[in-house]
Amino acid sequence: MNIHIEDQLVDNLKIIWEETTQYSGLKVVDVSPKLRVIQDFLTTQFWPSLVRFIASGVLNRHGRIKEYSGFMFPEDLDPGDDPFEGVMIFDPLDTIYLSDTVFDRLMNRYFQKLIEGATKYEKDVLKEDWWIEFLDIAKEIEQRVNG
């Protein structure tokens, strides 16, 4: 399935921090089937690794692919690849397309909720070397979103 997703659907996604004995981290919840790819990509118990991997790609518009899932920008295409507009998010089962602006808004909300949760629950990542750089990246993305 290759579909263009309306901005409003993405803007209405609910991103929460869950803190239980079974899970600690961000979740994308109450998702329509059209947005399953986003939910599966962003909801992981290994969120520190995911964030380290994708944050600079979001900021610099460089695609990130891990285990056949990820996101790409038109600038990532090789000669002869089928062109597209916006941002492609994909996994082995589905591919969806978002506008550039809604992708930035989504990732800004995701990163801001992550910073809020990690700070509130005093997660170990706050002491990691990469965390300060991530905060700078998140701030730049927030500034891009807010103009």
For each predicted feature, which ranges?
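Short, isolated positions within intrinsically disordered regulatory regions of eukaryotic proteins
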Residues: 21, 51, 75-77, 134-135
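Residue-level detector of alpha-helical secondary structure
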Residues: 10, 14, 104-111, 115, ...
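Residues that form generic nucleotide/phosphate-binding pockets
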Residues: 16, 40-41, 53, 106, ...
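Short, Lys/Arg-rich amphipathic alpha-helical interaction segments
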Residues: 123-147
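Acidic, low-complexity intrinsically disordered regions
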Residues: 13, 43, 80, 126-127
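Negatively charged, low-complexity tracts enriched in Asp/Glu with abundant Ser/Thr
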Residues: 2-68
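Amphipathic protein-protein interaction modules
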Residues: 67-125
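Residue-level signal for secondary-structure boundary elements
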Residues: 50, 62, 66-67, 115-122, ...
